[in-house]
């Protein structure tokens, strides 16, 4: 008997419960490989108990929620597929440079879904950390179908109210760090009404990101205007289970979303079990038909003064003809040719979300970002470990005590800081990077390094105010931001980081005695308590990625401003 056959026989001799324990040391791909080894092994391996363990080992949901999610899906195997391929890669904090007060999108598990919620720049009451009251707004969600498939919805609004914009998930890479909103070309099968994704891009076809910025913006406008579905506010707010929501309501909402994704505006009169052979696909737009009787420039030639062609926007299509004439095509020719190539690559066009990996560079924990691209960037969140105790997301306000407001005021500006460890001149430092602030006008741009602390250098400075009842575990020497505006050339002054507990810090500027107090945050727990308020979403493009430089809070003051011109 050969070794492989002998090993298979040993596995078959194991009781199911014993194999389930062993399966904790196997990956989902290992389980799938065993299933392919034969019918006998499949009967042992491909069981609900085994896949339940695999769902646990993904480590994105507690066991209780895994069991609750199973009610709305065909099997734990299908659920594991959704957790591995969609939920785990997307969870975390995603950011953008603009507006400069902060653009933080927190992606977390919903109910048989993964949801993106924007944390709004805001002022908070003294008891905010105890009451967990924060303002947030829906950005997008990906729902899980009965078979483990997925469907994408972008949140937004038009003049009549809140909308959902159904679309496609165009791929999620395991280690993705860039999230892109795009218009995707689709090919119709000649034999039926089904839609299939192209197997590969033909040589010379232009991807969406290579179009001029204004063309991308107009295409997104066209598609969202045609696929948007109006919803009532409660449907727009119940993205995740809270203490106030019950399982019945969440199941009802999910059923509605699945219908909307499948049938579009006709969802109220349809059942999910129906084939739904519609004469059109509710998620797709026949842009080329719209352009048949109109010059395509009717849609695209607006705001020509804003067109910029970057080196990445050069076109393969023009390369041969231009080289033969030994002339360089103009920016207008490149732009027009790229647009024509893109529009010819599909019969219809839909909204797409793609999560991909790029080798990004960082400056003090903040990613270098591309302008004029509808992108969100993942901010690495390090878990607190023994040698990096203070890593992670922190929220706080200026002043002491932490819960006291200045005289005559009832609220203080909320700051979110990401704390990371780096090596600087052979020394280990703790960097506090600002990712959100709640002032009316920005004082420091998004991504500013608020302080740098030498974590191995104790501070001898005393705490500047009377705190007899407070015991400080440690204090470290460092420097905090002062004058200057920007990222790389800010002024700084000496300061100290005081550790009250591992979840409560205070940084003090030595000269001014100015102080910011910080508490460690768990946004999932805060949002699931349901005590915060949901701010209506903005125009769909603006709601995903705000592209204009601004020092104001665009997600509250301009939430009803539906004009999105750059």
Curated annotation (Swiss-Prot):
It comes from the Eukaryota. Residues 8-54 form the F-box domain. InterPro entries: At5g39450-like, F-box-like_dom_sf, F-box_dom. PANTHER family: F-BOX PROTEIN FAMILY-LIKE, OS08G0105100 PROTEIN. Residues 318-338 are annotated as: Disordered. PROSITE patterns: FBOX. Residues 320-332 have a biased composition (Low complexity). This is Probable F-box protein At5g39490. It comes from Arabidopsis thaliana.
């Amino acid at each position: 008997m050969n070794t492989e056959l002998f090993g298979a026989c040993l596995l078959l001799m194991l009781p199911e419960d014993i194999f389930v324990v062993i399966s904790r040391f196997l990956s989902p791909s290992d389980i799938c490989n065993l299933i392919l080894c034969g019918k006998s092994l499949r009967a042992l391996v491909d069981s609900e108990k085994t896949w339940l363990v695999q769902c646990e080992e993904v480590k994105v949901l507690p066991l209780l929620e895994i069991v609750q999610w199973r009610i709305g899906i065909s099997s734990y195997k299908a659920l594991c597929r959704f957790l591995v391929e969609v939920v785990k890669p997307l969870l975390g904090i995603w950011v953008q440079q603009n507006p400069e007060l902060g653009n933080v999108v927190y992606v977390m598990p919903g109910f048989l879904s993964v949801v993106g919620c924007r944390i709004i720049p805001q002022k908070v009451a003294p008891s905010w950390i105890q009451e967990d009251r924060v303002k947030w707004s829906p950005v997008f969600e990906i729902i899980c179908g009965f078979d483990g498939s997925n469907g994408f919805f972008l949140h937004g609004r038009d003049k009549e109210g809140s909308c959902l914009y159904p679309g496609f998930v165009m791929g999620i890479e395991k280690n993705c760090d860039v999230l892109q909103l795009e218009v995707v070309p689709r090919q119709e099968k000649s034999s039926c009404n089904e839609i299939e994704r192209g197997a590969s891009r033909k040589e010379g076809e232009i991807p969406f990101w290579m179009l001029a910025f204004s063309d991308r913006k107009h295409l997104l406008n066209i598609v969202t205007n045609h696929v948007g579905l109006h919803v009532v506010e409660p449907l727009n707010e119940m993205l995740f289970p809270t203490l106030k929501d019950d399982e019945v309501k969440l199941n009802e909402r999910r059923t509605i979303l699945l219908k909307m994704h499948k049938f579009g505006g006709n969802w109220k009169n349809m059942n999910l079990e129906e084939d739904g052979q519609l004469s059109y696909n509710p998620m797709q737009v026949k842009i080329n038909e719209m352009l048949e009787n109109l010059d395509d420039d009717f849609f695209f030639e607006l705001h020509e003064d804003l067109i910029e062609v970057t080196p990445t926007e050069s076109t393969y299509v023009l390369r041969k003809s231009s080289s033969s004439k030994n002339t360089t095509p103009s920016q207008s020719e490149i732009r027009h040719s790229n647009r024509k190539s893109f529009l010819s690559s599909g019969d219809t066009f839909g909204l797409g979300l793609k999560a991909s990996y790029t080798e990004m560079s960082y400056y003090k924990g903040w990613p270098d970002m591309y302008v004029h691209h509808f992108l969100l960037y993942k901010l690495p969140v390090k878990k607190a470990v023994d040698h990096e105790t203070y890593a992670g997301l922190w929220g706080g306000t200026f002043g002491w005590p932490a819960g006291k407001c200045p005289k005559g005021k009832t609220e203080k500006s909320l700051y979110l800081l990401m704390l990371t460890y780096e090596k600087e001149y052979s020394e280990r430092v703790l960097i506090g990077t600002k990712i959100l602030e709640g002032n009316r006008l920005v004082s420091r741009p998004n991504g500013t390094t608020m302080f740098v602390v030498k974590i191995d250098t104790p501070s001898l400075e005393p705490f500047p105010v009377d705190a007899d009842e407070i015991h400080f575990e440690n204090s470290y020497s460092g420097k905090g931001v002062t004058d200057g505006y920007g990222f790389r050339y800010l002024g700084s002054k000496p300061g100290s980081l005081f550790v009250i507990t591992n979840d409560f810090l205070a940084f003090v500027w030595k000269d001014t005695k100015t102080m910011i107090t910080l508490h460690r945050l768990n946004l999932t727990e805060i949002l699931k308590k349901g005590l915060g308020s949901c701010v209506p979403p903005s125009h769909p493009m603006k709601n995903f990625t705000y592209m204009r430089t601004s020092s104001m809070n665009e997600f509250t003051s301009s939430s009803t401003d539906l004009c999105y011109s750059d």
